[in-house]
Amino acid sequence: LDVTNKIALDGSMREILRMLNTKLSTFVYNITQEGMDENWRSRRKAVSPMHDVLTVAYFLDNSIVKLKPAYIDVVTEGIARGQSIVDIGGHWNENKCNAKYAYDVDVVKFYKLFYKEIFNEDITDLVEGK
C-alpha cells in the first residue's frame, strides 16, 4: 500500500546528488543520511524514504501516481496511534469512500521530475533502464 517505498532514494540515486555538488544537492544528500542509516538498521535496506517529496511531485504532475477511492481513517489510540487505516475493499464501512489513496507510482517519471525540477538535471538516461 505504501507506494513511497517504490521511490525511496537508493544509493545510486543518492550518489547523483553528491556528484552534482551544488549547495542544494549536498543539503539533500546530507539530510537523507539519517533515513538511509535508520532503514539499514531496522530493515537492512539501503534506502532513504521520500514521503513528502512524492506528495509535492503529485501536485506538480498528478499522472505520477494512480489513485483509488477508499474509506481512510487515522487511529487515535493504542499501539497503532497515528497510523492511517485504508478500507480497500469497503468491508468495514459499507463501501463508503472519504478519500483516495495512491496504489502505484511511475518511478521513472518521478525521478525525472525530481531531478529536473529541483536540480535542473535531465537524468533520463540514468533512470530509463532502472
Regions found by a protein language model. Name each.
Residues 1-130:
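N-terminal acidic, glycine/proline-rich low-complexity segments
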